[in-house]
Swiss-Prot record:
PANTHER family: ARMADILLO REPEAT-CONTAINING PROTEIN 6 (PTHR22895:SF0). This is Armadillo repeat-containing protein 6. It comes from Homo sapiens. Changing residue 267 to R: Does not affect histidine methylation by METTL9. ARM repeats lie at residues 220-264, 274-318, 319-369, 370-412. GO terms for cellular component: cytosol. The gene is ARMC6. The modification Pros-methylhistidine is found at residue 263. Keywords: Methylation, Phosphoprotein, Repeat.
Length: 501
């Protein structure tokens, strides 16, 4: 772009010039959609550019100033067919048409506009950001209330539009919307499609939004989520969405609050809503569906937060299902092989979670879990995620359990862990978990130190220690317990300034 128009493209700070790297690191600058549109219009009117070229030039200029354009619709506004209005973006024109149809109570038109609204917002997150800025939520909320009179098709379209709009924008859901969402789920519990879309709204509203989580839990959403899995136990989309929403309820991901209620929510799911039983029973309907099994296992692992919950998984038959799933994956027994590696990772994560209970550790070993874990790591050696979770699960099984350590070593667990370290030298997670496993295997006796050292463990651990800062402490602990020389340094002696006499 020519210098004569450069000064017109100011994002606020650093007018007409490219920001330094220090400035870019300090703040990510943003502009309003109107500012971008004005720049595009200037290119068209003053520099005789075509719409596409005008947009491209505007993008290049703003990005050169360090402006974040991720929430900007990067197309030229269009003139309406009759030319009676100012140029506007398609999403805003559609929003205007939708508002008019809702105000006139024309359900068929409303449904058609909602469908088009969803399609546009799915294609570009900037569209839903702009729509939210221009009042999309109250318009969709009004359409939603219009649909509650008994139009199931319009109700589904309204929920779909709400789920798209709140994706990444959970602040949009207000108290009225929250109550209507719970009421809609309650009144339409028998309708799979409505339940699925409503739960998706719950998930989007709760992700990174602690207040929405707490308010929805108080409004009674948890029994609706577990009930959806029970009631629609063969409907893959409903089960998937419900599992995802349950997991989101156990997240602590909102940086705006000092602490969340993730632990309490997990307890409520298990104790008040029989969450573990619901999930374990649901697996029986999807034994040939790795994708849904991954969701169910991933949710189980989020709920195994207390000693008694870990034992409950075993008592409900969950352990035998987990070990069987792992064995089936290792033996290629599943008809659908797509997604098997993800399922293996989730099963391993769940075994790791329930192995926090010492009695469950022994139950896993008795059920043949160690052999299946070692086989999974060997078979999926190219996957750093599987290797990390395998080492972590074995690490938990060996913790405070010398007999389990012997079974792991004799079953090839140490060999597999060292192979994983060789295969993924740049993966800090693999290196860290492998070091912790080796440390636990030899912590209560030196019988396995020499065999493990003979496999080249010392060099691999030293390599992990030098390559990854996160491995420093666990690597030193592993080397120390293996009987290797480790230089232990005092990090602070208290001899600086006036701290020492």
């Amino acid at each position: 772009m020519s210098e004569r128009c450069c000064s017109r493209y100011s994002s606020g700070a650093s007018i007409g010039c490219t920001p330094t790297s220090t400035q870019a690191k300090m703040v990510s600058k943003r502009i309003a959609q109107e500012t971008f549109d004005a720049a595009v219009r200037e290119n068209i009117e003053e520099f005789a550019m075509g719409p596409e070229e005008a947009v491209k030039e505007a993008v290049e200029q703003f990005e050169s100033q360090g402006v974040d354009l991720s929430n900007i619709v990067k197309t030229a506004p269009k003139v309406s067919a009759d030319g009676s209005q100012e140029p506007t973006h398609d999403i805003l024109q559609m929003l205007s048409d939708l508002q008019e149809s809702v105000a006139s109570s024309r359900p068929q038109e409303v449904s058609a506009y909602l469908t088009r609204f969803c399609d546009q917002c799915k294609q570009d997150k900037a569209c839903r950001f702009l729509a939210a800025q221009k009042g999309a939520y109250p318009i969709i909320f009004t359409a939603w209330k219009l649909a509650t009179a008994g139009d199931q098709g319009l109700l589904l379209q309204s929920l779909n539009a709400l789920s798209v709009l709140t994706d990444g924008q959970p602040d949009l859901l207000d108290a009225q919307g929250l109550q209507l969402l719970v009421a809609t789920l309650t009144q339409n519990a028998d309708e799979a499609d409505l339940t699925c879309s409503g739960i998706r709204c719950v998930r989007h509203a709760c992700l990174k939004h602690e207040q929405n989580r707490q308010d929805l839990v108080k409004a009674g959403v948890l029994p609706l989520l577990t009930g959806a899995i029970t009631h629609h136990g063969h409907h893959t989309d409903v089960v998937r969405e419900a599992c995802w929403a349950l997991r989101v309820m156990t997240f602590d991901d909102d940086i705006r609050v000092p602490f969340g209620h993730a632990h309490n929510h997990a307890k409520m799911i298990v104790q008040e809503n029989k969450g573990l039983k619901v999930l374990i029973e649901a697996t029986k309907a999807f034994l040939d569906n790795p994708g849904i099994l991954s969701e169910l296992c991933g949710t189980l692992s989020r709920l195994a937060i207390r000693n008694e919950f870990c034992q409950e998984v075993v008592d409900l038959g969950g352990l035998s299902i987990l070990v069987s799933l792992l064995a089936d994956c290792n033996d290629h027994q599943m008809r659908d092989q797509s997604g098997v590696q993800e399922l293996v990772k989730q099963v391993l994560s769940t075994l790791r979670a329930i192995a926090g209970n010492d009695d469950v550790k022994d139950a896993i070993v008795r059920a043949g879990g160690t052999e299946s874990i070692v086989a999974a790591m060997t078979q999926h050696l190219t996957s750093p995620q599987v290797c990390e979770q395998s080492c972590a699960a074995l690490c938990f099984l060996a913790l405070r359990k010398p007999d389990n350590s012997r079974i792991i070593v004799e079953g090839g667990g140490a060999v597999a862990a060292l192979q994983a370290m060789k295969a993924h030298p740049q993966k800090a997670g693999v290196q860290k978990q492998a070091c912790m496993l080796i440390r636990n295997l030899v912590a209560h006796g030196q019988a396995f130190s020499k065999p493990i050292l003979d496999l080249g463990a010392e060099a691999l651990i030293m390599q992990a220690r030098s390559a990854h800062r996160d491995c420093e402490d666990v690597a030193k602990a592993a080397l120390r317990d293996l009987g290797c020389h480790v230089e232990l340094r005092e990090l602070w002696t208290g001899q600086r300034g006036n701290l020492a006499p």
